[in-house]
A protein has these predicted regions:
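N-terminal secretory signal peptides that target proteins for export/translocation
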Residues: 1-10
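Residue-level detector of alpha-helical transmembrane segments in integral membrane proteins
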Residues: 4-5, 24, 258
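N-terminal non-cleavable signal-anchor helices
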Residues: 9-11, 22, 148
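Aromatic- and Gly/Pro-enriched helix-to-coil junctions and flexible linker segments
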Residues: 28-802
Length: 802
């Protein structure tokens, strides 16, 4: 390296003498200067080994960022809004403003990467500070002036312990306060928080990884050349953009409906690379020109002028917590054409973008056949439920404690008499309005009361519109529920809630839950618009709490559909069991007319809810899942044909699914287990242990763990899955096959926190464990092996310090 690139060379002996004198002087002046004296701030050895050839971002830098940095810096809740999942996120830098702020009085300006600003200069105007030195011309200054480098260097200078828990004072809680220092503030930050370099609260980078990142930063953080779309992919993009940009009123209305439901998706072309995805956006430029996205808070916001629907390659890394894939294919295109264009109907005018119309899909899309709309949603029901599980609304208790820890979802058949009666839905559209039409406001009590009245009017009008001969025999009532034609696995879903995150799987998984949702078209559509299309993560406290309160109403309606299937004599007992404790009166706000009227007859036992679940499992047949023992068919069910290691591990873990009681409160909500077989790593087995916490009710907005409020620890249990489930693992366990029975026995023997700590010390992978990254890498690779299209980078923000 040229002498012009850094201070003049100093012989080692003289350097040590000078460094000692400088350190002594600095010690007399201020402890901060001693902590971060100049020789420590920059790695001269790495500057001396700086390669002449540029470090390639895509092939050399991005894999390191994805495996070590994106695990925490990948979404709205990335610390300091520093999104390291894309080069543009690094160039944008960080911000002291937080996205998730449920108490703000005024809505915040949106800061969505690739949408709300397109250049670094625009982000600076929005208050983002650089983490790269954007002006430096020599390697030394590029490092010394880079907050990102200084964070990495701080961790090198102050590595964390190699055993035990993290040092006191390091907060890894979800709502921890972030410092987000600028370059001018960094010396103070490093002095006050010397053990909070990057990776934060996790082991250091490997030397080769650290060297690659430092060399890349010293070279000026060059980016790779933009990728060119493969010809076959470009052809499919052109086909879909042509379909979405038709000029007739019918084509434009259908395209708007599709956009407002798919805007959050990771669109994948069948037959292409499993890691290639696109996003559907509105652009001011037509197909064939560079995309210029139109930034509106919500997908139904007024575009303000002419626009085109465009498919944009999904930029950046695929992150599990916001990855909701949706397949595009020639067959899908043909199906959509048949669904929306081979039905006889007319569109006389396009709906406005005024909030009271645009936020109400029953008004905006009244011209589209109800059967087509509902069929579109049912075909990929998991995608639309995942929208609110993985969308911006997903983070935190205020959003998710409206749901149970595990419950099933089923759907009414689109061809049943009530579901196919579009006339009454059109007539009741005004009653189906939701608080999202008011956007940001602080009228919490009056808003809740207003929309609750609309809900009751809707339910009463719906009762009058139901032309069913009641009561129905059980077999006929079961026929009103969709079975997916016997082939569509979206006919039944299981939702797992993990305190402040959640996940969705196909099938009825685990033991029969306390509650289930039976959804019809109006419910499914309202959930999407309330929690996905209409939810603004940058909105004020009024918007966020009104959203949460109204979701309570929708959840109760969905659960009431289950109650309607039960005999009248048990409904109140079941209903009251869902709403105990401090919120016992809340459900009385909605009083179903049928609570004392038998609607379904033919039960043969004194446990009708369990009997109903048994019938549902039988009706769905292979579409319901029994995780352990694993499903099999033919010779595969012969124990001699199944690997002995798999049988041994499955038999051991099956015992955990029968665990009950208060011990669960000591366990992580989501734990990943790797059973090491001793051969190739990819042959090892993966399990997920989910804690199903029991609650007196799920209607309290806050105070998740206040004793006596909502928790009923005696009803806690475990769900064990022979695959990886969840985007936010809270702990890893690595178990040799030879110890799998011991692992289960000790797990089953946990009675208190001390027992759990001893168990963790033997089998767990703590944040301080030098093998932590090896474990994380294996689980990320395993997720890709299990689901090549659906998998994304796991998020470690919720990983516990135990």
């Amino acid at each position: 390296m040229s002498s012009s690139l850094r201070p003049a060379y100093v012989p080692p002996a003289a350097f040590l003498l000078i460094a000692g004198v400088l350190a002594a002087i600095a010690a007399c002046a201020t402890p901060r200067a001693a902590t971060l004296s100049m020789p420590l701030r920059v790695d001269y050895e790495l500057l001396d080994s700086l390669p002449a050839q540029p470090i390639d971002y895509e092939s050399q830098v991005r894999p390191i960022l994805e495996s070590r940095c994106v695990v925490c810096h990948g979404c709205y809740d990335a610390p300091c809004q520093l999104k390291l999942s894309a080069y543009e996120g690094i160039a944008r830098g960080g911000s002291k403003e937080v996205v998730y702020d449920g108490a703000r009085i005024s809505a915040a300006d949106p800061t969505r990467l690739f949408i709300d600003a397109l250049t670094t200069a625009e982000w600076r105007k929005k208050g983002f500070h650089a983490v790269l030195d954007e002006a430096a011309k020599d390697p030394y200054q590029r490092l010394d002036g880079s907050v990102l480098y200084r964070m990495l260097r701080l961790k090198q200078l102050h590595p964390q312990p190699l055993t035990g828990r993290l040092p006191p004072g390091i907060d890894v809680g979800l709502d921890r306060k972030a410092s987000c220092p600028t370059l001018a503030e960094f010396d103070d930050y490093a002095s006050e928080h010397p053990q909070q370099g990057m990776p934060f609260a996790l082991p250091n980078l490997e030397p080769e990884q650290y060297q690659t990142l430092v060399h890349w930063l010293a070279q000026g953080a060059p980016r790779s050349a933009a990728e060119v779309l493969d010809a076959s992919v470009a052809e499919q993009v052109a086909t879909w953009e042509h379909f979405l940009n038709g000029q007739s009123l019918k084509e434009r209305l259908v395209a708007r409906y599709l956009y407002e439901h798919l805007f959050l998706g990771s669109l994948h072309f069948s037959g292409q690379s499993p890691r290639s995805f696109f996003q559907l956006v509105r652009s001011s430029t037509p197909p064939g020109q560079p995309i210029v996205p139109i930034a509106t808070r919500r997908p139904y916001g007024d575009p303000g002028g002419p626009f085109f629907y465009r498919l944009r390659p999904q930029p950046g890394s695929v992150v599990a917590k916001n990855h909701v894939p949706y397949e595009l294919s020639p067959a899908r295109l043909e199906w959509l054409h048949e669904l929306f264009f081979e039905t006889d109907y007319a569109v006389a005018a396009l709906p406005s973008y005024e909030p009271e119309v645009a936020s109400n899909p029953f008004r905006a899309f009244a011209a589209l056949p109800l059967r087509s709309r509902y069929g579109f949603l049912l075909e990929d029901a998991r995608f639309f439920i995942e929208g609110f599980i993985k969308g911006p609304v997903c983070r935190g208790q205020v959003a998710l404690n409206v749901i149970e820890d595990r419950f099933w979802i089923l759907f009414f058949d689109p061809d049943s008499p009530l579901a196919s009666n579009s006339s009454y839905i059109d007539q009741l559209a005004e009653y189906l309005a939701q608080p999202i039409e008011m956007e940001d406001n602080l009228r919490l009590v009056t808003s809740y009361g207003h929309y609750l009245k609309l809900e009751n009017r809707y339910l009463e009008a719906r009762r009058k519109a139901a032309h069913l001969a009641l009561p129905l025999p059980l077999d006929r009532a079961l026929g009103l529920l969709w079975n997916g034609g016997g082939t569509n696995p979206n006919a039944a879903l299981t939702v797992y809630r993990h305190t402040d995150s959640a996940s969705v799987d196909q099938g009825l998984i685990g033991e029969p839950p306390e509650t289930a949702w039976f959804l019809d078209y109006p419910l499914l559509e309202r959930i999407h618009y309330l929690l996905v299309a209409g939810f603004d993560v940058y909105g004020n406290v009024g918007h966020q709490l009104n959203t949460r309160l109204h979701m309570d109403v929708l959840r109760m309606e969905a659960e009431d559909h289950l109650l309607a299937y039960l005999p009248a004599k048990v409904r109140k007992t079941v209903h009251d069991g869902w709403y105990q404790g401090i919120r016992s009166g809340e459900a009385e706000d909605i009083v179903p007319w049928w609570m004392d009227v038998d609607l379904v007859t033919g039960y043969q036992t004194d446990q009708p809810q369990q009997e109903l679940y048994t019938h549902l499992l039988a009706r769905l047949g292979p579409l319901s899942k029994s995780p352990i023992p694993r499903p099999c068919s033919g010779r595969d069910c012969d124990s001699e044909a199944r690997p002995a290691a798999l049988l041994r591990a499955d038999q051991a873990f099956q015992k955990l699914s029968h665990m009950r009681g208060k011990f669960v409160e000591f366990l992580p909500d989501v734990a990943f287990v790797r059973v090491v077989l001793g051969g190739a790593p990819e042959a090892d087995l993966a399990y997920t242990l989910l804690s199903d916490k029991s609650y007196d009710n799920v209607s309290s907005m806050f105070s998740e763990q206040k004793p006596g409020d909502r928790r009923d620890a005696s009803g806690d249990r475990q769900t064990v899955l022979p695959w990886l489930e969840g985007s936010y693992p809270e702990f890893f366990f690595v178990v040799p096959l030879s110890e799998v029975e011991s692992f289960v026995a000790r797990y089953d023997g946990i009675q208190n926190r001390d027992d759990y700590e001893r168990f963790t010390a033997r089998f767990g992978v703590r944040r301080t464990n030098p093998a932590f990254w090896q474990a994380a890498d294996w689980f990320n690779a395993q997720a890709l092996r299990e689901q090549p299209v659906r998998a994304g980078i796991l998020d470690l923000n919720r990983y516990q310090d135990r």
